[in-house]
Amino acid sequence: KFIDTGLGMTADEVEEYITQIAFSGATEFLSKYKDKTTDDQIIGHFGLGFYSAFMVADEVHIDTLSYKEGAAPVHWTCDGGTEYDMQEGNKTTVGTEITLFLNDESTEFSNEYRMREIIEKYCSFMPVNIYLSKENAPQEYETIDEAELRDDDVIVERIHEDAKTEEKENDKGEKEVVEVSPAKDKVKINKRPVSLSDPEPLWMKHPNSCTDEEYKEFYRKVFMDYKEPLFWIHLNMDYPFNLKGILYFPKINTEYDSIEGTIKLYNNQVFIADNIKEVIPEFLLLLKGVIDCPDLPLNVSRSALQNDGFVKKISEYITKKVADKLTGMCKTDRESYEKYWDDISPFIKY
């Protein structure tokens, strides 16, 4: 099941955004987007991606309740054919719930660890929090200070801890009882779910608000490389296209390490693929980094690109930023430039 706490949908909206694309306008819709420019991208069109569910499921149910006043809950079912059933449902909370009845070839997606692997690979930095819960798992608990209690916490028990005291000798050599820990009011609550995603990755922040330690920690987290990078470039461009990212120059030990880097490409904080050569100049594939370009012209396969002219501009921009960084270092920080020469010389020579 996929459950959200969003706006939900009315019956008319389910009909418009889910049903019509599939059964009345699929051919026209695809024809409309064929050979169009980047303004008419097919990827990300609301409702279309939903139908990939039938690649793994024999049957799909949607239960939704709109936030709109007086809206009735909707229950929609389809087995992937040309017919569907829609009637009033029994959902009582605003949002949408999608249930997949997996086919025999796709039972791997019912495995908790496989799902965690997929989420962490593709959705680690989605702009919403993603939680993974196992049905019928035993309830876990945690104890927190009462002052830390949130409105959505489920309280199991309230706990009062008396102040702790010790007998100590004062300056006069007399014994006296002193308080070493004040009384505390605590609460035992249902354990809070832990998000698998970070909605505000470092590359989305302004470079001036990021510390060196944050850059290094992000590098360790994303690339599982505990050798510190030499330096990095924070990309932050809004015009003529939207592109953000961080490129790291790793220390290259050609004797022991592979000299192939990893540059992860994202679209609206969703992972697309590693090392797409149409976007990343080949000589920069020694670097490690992340690049997020919402304007990237993806086609239906998501990993392939269209519109070579636009992609070429992105590639040229990235190359220029790397060249500017190395040129600036040569002019203003000659000592570091010479110290890192063995590691940066492949880029200079190119």
Which residues make up each language-model segment?
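GHKL (Bergerat-fold) ATPase N-terminal catalytic module, capturing the glycine-rich phosphate-binding loop
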Residues: K1-S110, E117, S124-F125, E140-A147, ...
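Conserved, well-folded catalytic cores of nucleic-acid-processing
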Residues: Y17-E28, K32, K36, V56-D63, ...
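GHKL/Histidine-kinase-like ATPase module
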Residues: Y113, D152-I291
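Helical mechanochemical/support elements of P-loop NTPase systems and associated helical scaffolds
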Residues: T10-Y17, T38-F46, S52, V56, ...
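Cytosolic catalytic regions of ATP/NTP-dependent phosphoryl-transfer enzymes
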Residues: H61-E69, P73-D145, V178, K191-N208, ...
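Glycine- and acidic
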Residues: F2-I3, Q41, L100-F101, P201-W203, ...
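A contiguous, basic/glycine-rich beta-loop/short-helix subdomain that forms a polymer-engagement track
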Residues: E335, K339-Y350
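Extended, well-ordered alpha-helical scaffold/bundle regions in very large, multi-domain proteins
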Residues: L298-S336
